[in-house]
């Protein structure tokens, strides 16, 4: 009898311990379940948005009752913009620059309510402005990544425009494939170009040493880990020279390149007949452009002809800023010496 009671006690004890352990794990798993629920919701929202994007079918958002009548309301469910392709120029006519926000009560977030600018072939334009005013947003609308809420956008066929970001995409392929991207190797062969043609392009961007350094054109590597920041950006310019589009949008794509090499690449691009639209803060690039689109924020912008007196005023302003900074150098040196003395005194 005692033996049976002992067996029952041990068995029940094990069951109770297992139940306690299961309950404990269930309580601790609550945090993981909550995290999974949040991630599932985000993934579902992403997939739903991608399906809507594919079919251009967005749920209409009603205009908020407290929104003033004279304030535009941008709704992805009612896109009124008109896109005209296969033109030989780029023209924005009353195009709002709006950050899309699917499902938000206020619709998109406007950065600029109406942009009007006309870029003919050879009218190289530079886009400047402080952070957050919509410089890159203009390029995204031109590329079709962001919707055209209103107005008219005229532009060439997408094959005639090339976009170069600040950090170019580098695939896990051969060195040759990095230069010809996004074209395939088969398309490269069909074009009739040779490796010597590619070498000439690399010379133009000061990367002629790469084939020897990396082991030839067929070497396959993780190029994003092999190339430096400046080399990556020069590889992006090599792709521009390889494809030779009619228009090129350069979004800070030479920020890690020295000024002299940058100037040579810009000059060569212009010699090829590529119309450049540059997004940058670097005043050294002004001389390669005819137009300046200055986005000032607060729904204001200005289109300046850099061939006129405005260019002189802009350069004079830059020189004034540089002189002001140079005048502060001596004060910075004195402050640095004082800090060194204080540190030396504290250690002693």
Model-derived segments and their meaning:
Residues 12-60:
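Cytosolic ends of transmembrane helices, especially the final helix of ABC transmembrane type-1 domains
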Residues 128-130:
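The feature captures the beta-strand-to-loop junction immediately N-terminal to the Walker
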């Amino acid at each position: 009898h005692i033996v049976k009671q002992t067996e029952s006690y041990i068995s029940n004890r094990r069951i109770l311990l297992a139940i306690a352990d299961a309950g404990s794990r269930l309580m601790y798993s609550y945090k993981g379940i909550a995290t999974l629920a949040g991630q599932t919701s985000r993934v579902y929202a992403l997939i739903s948005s991608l399906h809507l994007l594919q079919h251009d079918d967005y749920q209409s958002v009603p205009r908020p009752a407290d929104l003033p009548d004279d304030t535009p309301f941008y709704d992805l469910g009612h896109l009124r913009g008109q896109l005209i392709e296969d033109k030989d120029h780029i023209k924005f006519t009353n195009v709002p620059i709006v950050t899309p926000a699917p499902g938000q009560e206020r619709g998109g977030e406007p950065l600029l309510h109406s942009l009007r600018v006309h870029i003919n072939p050879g009218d190289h334009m530079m886009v400047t402005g402080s952070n957050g005013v919509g410089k890159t947003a203009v390029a995204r609308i031109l590329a079709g990544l962001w919707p055209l809420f209103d107005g008219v956008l005229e532009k060439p066929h997408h094959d005639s425009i090339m976009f170069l970001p600040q950090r170019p995409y580098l695939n896990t392929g051969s060195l040759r494939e990095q230069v010809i991207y996004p074209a395939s190797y088969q398309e490269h062969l069909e074009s009739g170009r040779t490796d010597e043609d590619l070498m000439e392009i690399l010379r133009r961007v000061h990367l002629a040493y790469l084939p020897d350094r990396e082991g030839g054109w067929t070497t396959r590597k993780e190029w994003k880990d092999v190339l430096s920041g400046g080399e990556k950006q020069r590889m992006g310019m090599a792709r521009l020279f390889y494809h030779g589009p009619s228009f090129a949008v350069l979004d800070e794509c030479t920020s890690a390149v020295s000024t002299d090499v940058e100037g040579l690449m810009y000059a060569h691009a212009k010699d090829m007949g590529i119309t450049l639209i540059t997004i940058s803060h670097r005043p050294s690039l002004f001389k390669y452009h005819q137009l300046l689109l200055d986005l000032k924020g607060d729904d204001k912008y200005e289109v300046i002809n850099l061939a006129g007196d405005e260019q002189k005023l802009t350069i004079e302003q830059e020189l004034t800023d540089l002189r002001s900074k140079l005048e502060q150098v001596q004060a910075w040196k004195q402050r640095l010496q004082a800090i060194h003395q204080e540190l030396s005194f504290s250690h002693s």
